[in-house]
Amino acid sequence: MTTTRAKSKFQSLSACRFTPLPEPNTSPSTYSKTLPKPNSSPGTDGTFPTPFPLAVITPIKTLKSVTLSDWWLTKKGKDLCIKGFESNGASGVRLFSSGTISKRHESTTLEAIDGITISINGFINRSRCLENGISIEVCNRFRLGFPYDWEDYNEEEEEKKKKNVDISFDDIPVNRYQDLYSLEGCLKDKILDDVVGSLRDLVCQKSDKACEKSRVGDVDDDDDDDDDKSLVSRVVGVKTRGMLRRREEYEASIGKRVATMSGKRVVTVSKKKNRRRSFGW
């Protein structure tokens, strides 16, 4: 009995040891999903088709000339550069980044500082230019290519930067705010009066010169009596307080002259009458 049991155990162990494993199911549903092959161009260099990341930049060591179908402007400090897509036919499309533009052969043919000749086709890409800090005015000037006065771009941009200096209240220190708020009302009014007075003086100087010119012309053309009337009626200047005050003073002086002239005439007439009476005429 013991021997038969031992044989049966040995047979069961050998059967478990030598039993072949079941074959795997080779149905298509059990295959692992493979990544699709990249959609590479027929060329041998394996470049990416568009769209592709802008980090893929064409090496420019071996290039002598480049033709860009889509181009835009960039800046390196104060200098202008060009970026764009280079079309190589079967090789695909690559991104080209130039050095500083040093020479203009034609509006669409340029030369970089490293000696590469760049030909551009089509209109400028405005959206790319704006992303790189180029203004709309410059985009309009470089719309079809480089104008003949393209080198003046840097000077104009520098002048605009100097003129367009933004002044903000944040630039004023806090202690100045405190000084302004602590001023008394009379001092503020005095400062305002000084500012208005300086502006008034500037306006009066210009208007006085115009009045003098008109007075000289009127004196040469008319008589003395007509001059006084014409000066009063024709003087037209900036209507400020200073001008009105001077006009009133001038009219008053003219009135005094007329009064003195009429007074002298009355005195002479009365003297003549007295003489006639004394002689009995």
Swiss-Prot record:
InterPro entries: Centromere_KNL-2_homolog, SANTA. Keywords: Developmental protein. Residues 1-47 are annotated as: Disordered. PANTHER family: KINETOCHORE-ASSOCIATED PROTEIN KNL-2 HOMOLOG, PROTEIN EMBRYO DEFECTIVE 1674. The keyword Lipid metabolism does not apply. Required for normal embryo development. Residues 66-153 form the SANTA domain. The keyword Protease does not apply. Disulfide bonds: none annotated. It comes from the Eukaryota. This is Protein EMBRYO DEFECTIVE 1674. Residues 1-14, 24-41 have a biased composition (Polar residues).
